[in-house]
Amino acid sequence: MAVWLLRANMKQLDWIAVDWGTSSLRIWGLGADNQQVFYLASDEGMASMHDAQTFETTLLKHVAAYLPADKSIPVLCCGMVGAKQGWHDVGYQVLPCNPLTHQSPLRVPDTDPRLKVWILPGLSQQSPADVMRGEETQIAGLLSKLSAAKPFDGMICLPGTHSKWAQVETGEVIQFATFLTGELFALLGQQSVLRFSVSDSEWCEDTFVSAVKEAYANPAQLSHLVFSVRAADVLAQPQGKHGKARLSGLLIGLELAGAKGLASTKQVQLVGNDDLTKLYQTAMTALGLAVVVQSGDDLVLLGLQSAYQQILE
């Protein structure tokens, strides 16, 4: 277990925002003006919790020192904490919908009188069947940021182990699609014959971009193209030295080909903070898409702040 207290000050605590994923936990203590009182990050994600009580115990371990004794502090959570295996299963809102409604933050059971806990539900789509949990809060944050003048219309991409593409019209998510790109990369790179050609390979951006374009133009050939990563290495061809870049480019190119049918615009709001987001930006730019990069961390907090206003109202 690792815990990092990144910031703290002595402002009065008004409420707590929590982003609780599968492998990580982030906690913001906020004042009445949403200024930070404290910020904590930990690797105590849902996967390390044993039962519902463990969630509350873990949260209290980190925030008890900041809690007043004479009142209950609202706590608003998003992410896998609301899954069946989480603190409390809060289900999904069904599309089409605004990712935040007056009914969306759901009160959940807690036992400590110093806390009042709400969790945001995910989003679901009936046909084709799809679900998201956690990303809806980033989408809500983005809509809050971009919809000051008029409701947002456009496409949002959220890269990750399971990448999400969401189509928004007049402030509502009308459809989305999940792509298993990150998980496929891990499985192929670590548990298939490709592992011998990927693990120690050199990175090459030109190889990555070329692979993106190749898979985008020929998505039906992906299985063949993926094996060529191994073949090029065995035959000692130049691109064989860049197996990781080629495999990554092929899989992201396939995803972009699949997302092409969803997009009603050539501009994409790309949400993220890490190197993976930069790869998606490179790939989209190479294919002629206009990309606007948005901070995923900032949008999570902005989405939680927007949801908290729903509770106050």
Q: What is the predicted role of each segment?
A:
Residues W15-D19, P74-L76, G154-L158, Q269:
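Short glycine-aspartate micro-motif
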Residues W15-T54, Q294:
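Short glycine-rich, Thr/Ser-proximal phosphate-binding strand/loop in the N-terminal lobe
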Residues S24, T265-A283:
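Glycine-rich phosphate-binding loops at beta-strand->alpha-helix junctions
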Residues Q36-I73, G82-Q85, D89, L194-S197:
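N-terminal phosphate-binding loop and adjacent alpha-helix
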Residues A47, L123-N218:
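Glycine-rich phosphate-binding loop plus the immediately following alpha-helix
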Residues P68-A129, T170:
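Short beta-strand-loop/turn "lid" adjacent to the catalytic site in phosphate-handling enzymes
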Residues A215-G258:
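Adenine-nucleotide phosphate-binding core of ATP-dependent small-molecule kinases
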Residues L250, V292-E313:
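Glycine-rich phosphate-binding/hydrolytic loop that grips phosphoryl groups
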